């Protein structure tokens, strides 16, 4: 007699349905955890069987908004150790180039630009209302060398300035947020995106609305934003889960304004937002307004419409590829109506995700340790 496998389940924190979140005034931060008051236990699918399938994986970036791969780093082998992942010089010289090549191999893009990294090594504190969400950082890491001015920024790479996961179901950028990001975040990203921005601006100046750019994707070069996420030791608590964009209903997306750092050295023809009066921009303001998605909990009877996935006991070589936005996917993918009764007009280009609490996880286990690298990709 075979023993049935115990189903995977996790507890997720959503906005209370009908509530409108209060945006954080701080760069990167999502609203306070107190606003995520709807705690729901939901089923999960394990991605582990797909790790070695490569391009044959059933999880497709242009369908689900995520995939998973097995990938080793040079930092996993001697003479390097766990401490090497807190060494900014090694991350910049070894790991970031590895990630850029990895993204090229997985997606086929021609250029990949690492834009930020976050190392997490702290337990989440229930009382920390300003704790950052899964793809956020609450502080610039300190080190013996002043690297705060360097690009890409690295957050949380010291014990003193550690960053923790926080269970807030979200997607880091709406389509408009992604387009503002490539224009306003940093000159290296904006310059890499120059052809994209110029093509979109021509459409916008011809009268196309921002929300209708999805209907003109064939006239704009392909670009995407990714988060490449791996643990630094086996994950026993507070894993990261991904929700399938193919089934996440339009009624559960909640747009929310957010702040990001800005770079005033970006050339003006790339920095400007067509259709907005930017003449009175405060050049002393170090942030700009962008937009993310938060979410309401699923309402279907089986609670499966969000189709959550994770990697059980995720190892350092088990890598999650999280698509935050892809303009080519947005050109054809539409969020389904609730109950699967057809498609809405909302273009989707990425996967909602969150740190979560595994049912029956060991609450005495050490803090999860992970590194996330943000990448802008261009074809």
Swiss-Prot record:
EC number annotated for this UniProt entry: 1.-.-.-
Name assigned to this protein: Oxidoreductase chry3
Skewed-composition ranges (Acidic residues): 126-138
Leading EC class: oxidoreductase
A GO molecular-function annotation: oxidoreductase activity
Pathway(s) it belongs to: Pigment biosynthesis
Function summary: Oxidoreductase; part of the gene cluster that mediates the biosynthesis of the yellow pigment chrysogine. Pyruvic acid and anthranilic acid are likely substrates for the nonribosomal peptide synthetase chry1/NRPS14, with pyruvic acid adenylated by the first A domain and anthranilic acid by the second. If pyruvic acid and anthranilic acid are merged and released from chry1/NRPS14 by hydrolysis, a subsequent amidation would lead to 2-pyruvoylaminobenzamide. This process is probably catalyzed by the amidotransferase chry2 using glutamine as amino donor.
Keyword Oxidoreductase: yes
Family that this chain belongs to: Belongs to the asaB hydroxylase/desaturase family.
Keyword presence, 4Fe-4S: no
Keywords (A to Z) from UniProt: Oxidoreductase
PANTHER family: BLL6449 PROTEIN, OXIDOREDUCTASE AN1597
Start and end residues of each stretch annotated as Disordered: 1-23, 126-150
Taxonomic source organism: Gibberella zeae (strain ATCC MYA-4620 / CBS 123657 / FGSC 9075 / NRRL 31084 / PH-1)
